[in-house]
């Protein structure tokens, strides 16, 4: 492969590194596995880059490769819904200038939303994560998942409704 080819791939792919990693974390539930998925995605994409059609949606193409890589790597395995913790048993901390009370409330909110998303079926999770977390347009989500745009919209509506219901239910139980 020539250098121009590699530079073109780099320019298109590197800005997607963080969004792909975030999506891989959500899919796998494991930061180490997510890093492996992203690395494998980049290798596969670089090998197939010559077949990528200029003018089509590169972002959707990369997310589709990542998703397919995840699905083939997980064949026959049950997905783990546990969060990966560091060696001390604590989730990695985020530097914050909030008061301790606000930080605790924000962490509780984040955990509730994450738990609500984790309860969704994988087809609803994928659509919700791509549309709402990765901020993809409906058409991009449809291209990434190889489903009609109407299916994206209906799955997204159902996913949002289920998340909302779970949060309302969880908050109602705490009162």
Model-derived regions: residue spans:
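C-terminal edge and immediately downstream basic/flexible tail or linker adjoining helix-turn-helix-like DNA-binding
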Residues: 2-9, 82, 106, 139, ...
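Internal acidic/polar
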Residues: 80-106, 137
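Helix-turn-helix DNA-binding module
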Residues: 118, 122-126, 131-151, 165
């Amino acid at each position: 492969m020539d250098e121009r080819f590699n530079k073109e791939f780099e320019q298109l792919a590197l800005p997607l590194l963080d969004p792909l990693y975030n999506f891989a974390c959500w899919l796998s539930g494991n930061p180490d596995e997510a890093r492996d998925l992203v690395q494998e995605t980049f290798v596969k994409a670089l090998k197939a880059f010559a077949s990528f059609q200029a003018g089509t949606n590169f972002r959707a193409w990369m997310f589709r490769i990542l998703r397919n890589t995840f699905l083939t790597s997980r064949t026959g395995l049950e997905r783990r819904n546990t969060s990966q913790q560091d060696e001390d048993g604590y989730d990695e901390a985020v530097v914050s200038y909030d008061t301790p009370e606000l930080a605790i409330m924000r962490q509780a909110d984040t955990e509730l939303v994450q738990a609500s998303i984790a309860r969704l079926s994988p087809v609803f999770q994928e659509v919700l994560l791509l549309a709402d977390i990765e901020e993809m347009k409906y058409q991009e989500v449809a291209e990434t998942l190889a489903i009609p745009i109407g299916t994206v919209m209906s799955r997204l509506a159902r996913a949002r409704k289920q998340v909302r219901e779970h949060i309302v239910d969880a908050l109602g139980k705490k009162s």
